Amino acid sequence: MQQVKKVVLAYSGGVDTSVCIPYLKKEYGISEVITFVADLGQGEDLELIRQKALNSGASQSIVGNLVNSFVERYAFPAIRANALYLDKYPLSTALARPLIAENLVNIAREFSADAVAHGCTGKGNDQVRFDLAINALGPDLKIITPAREWNMSREEAIIYGEKFGIPAPVSKKSPYSIDVNLLGRSIEAGILEDPMQEAPEDIFAMTSSIDNSPDSPLDIEIIFKNGFPVGINDEFLTPVEIIKKANVLAGEHGYGRIDMIEDRVVGIKSREIYETPGLLLLIKAHKELESITLNPDIVDFKGIVEKKWGQIVYQGFWFGPLKDSLDAFISSTQTSVNGRVKIRLYKGNAIVIGRMSENNSLYRDDLATYSKDDVFKHSLAEGFIYMWGMSNKIWAELNSKTTD
């Protein structure tokens, strides 16, 4: 196999990716490591992270602002898909991986690199997402995965990094693994590995506790056009602004925490903690608006599509033919998803209290009402029921037991 001379490394500044830099150079004999830091709205000082990569031995360190692309190309399609893996997790972390992988491949092309690398461990989901996306976009590129091969625990990786002057950003006694982007935070490891251990309050940053959330409810309205959120409380916003505002409103009222047992791609169950206040709020509102603007059979079948969409994105198949086909179906359903949804935020809850669509509502007052304005033809119900239940009645007559 040809010796790799230049590699592009997905870099976060955390333990694993920081240790990857000296490890790639020392153990793999790679002469040039270029790091890529993705700005996904995580709120960190990315210039410090870029400098840390250079101090750790990177020949170049690139920061890419991907926030707009992340929201418009990844988060908003997930909202249209009502994407909830295992009916709970809105894919806040999973959505970022194919975007990062896409940029890794582009940078590798730009700098004529032989390979790309990431710091994912051998039993996580991200390794699958990165590898599948890279193979789809750059099948000729070699993928190097040091953390999958070095057999070091997190504590040992911290010690290895310290030998090369790399400071660890976590406590050795409580090494939580935290991933942050504009859509939310994921927290794992440490005492959270005990599924009966309550998550300590100090791990949360985007959401208030129930005790600290306001004692008065807040009613908000979310506006949609073609299935995309476009405004909150009559204020029309950019996609990024909508996510930010939804995060603040929902998070302040304690909505958006997820504590779940998750079925990982590699076959194990893991305990995961997520904070995704804005994304969960927008998905909830979008799904509610669909209930008044889509035909029942579309809603029913779209539910099947949504589940599959969430599964394949979680499993790493963002760049694939099935995902493209599901996207096409979802997109075809969204032209009528226009209107607004009223939600009450209170003490960890987001309660739908109203929904309307001026031009696309399938709800008709004159058919739904029980008042004198009712135009529903009640007399036709008997014939409908007779035909609707015919097959069941025939079965019952055939199988009923008669008594003398």
Curated annotation (Swiss-Prot):
It comes from the Bacteria. It catalyses: L-citrulline + L-aspartate + ATP = 2-(N(omega)-L-arginino)succinate + AMP + diphosphate + H(+). It is found in: Cytoplasm. SUPFAM superfamilies: Adenine nucleotide alpha hydrolases-like, Argininosuccinate synthetase, C-terminal domain. One of its GO terms (biological process) is urea cycle. One of its GO terms (molecular function) is ATP binding. CDD domains: ASS (cd01999). ATP binds at A10, Y11, S12, G13, G14, V15, D16, T17, S18, A38, G119. One of its GO terms (cellular component) is cytoplasm. It holds the Pfam family Arginosuc_syn_C. Its EC number is 6.3.4.5. L-aspartate binds at T121, N125, D126. Keywords: Amino-acid biosynthesis, Arginine biosynthesis, ATP-binding, Cytoplasm, Ligase, Nucleotide-binding. Pathway: Amino-acid biosynthesis; L-arginine biosynthesis; L-arginine from L-ornithine and carbamoyl phosphate: step 2/3. Belongs to the argininosuccinate synthase family. Type 1 subfamily. Homotetramer. HAMAP family: Arg_succ_synth_type1. This is Argininosuccinate synthase. It comes from Prochlorococcus marinus (strain MIT 9215). The gene is argG.
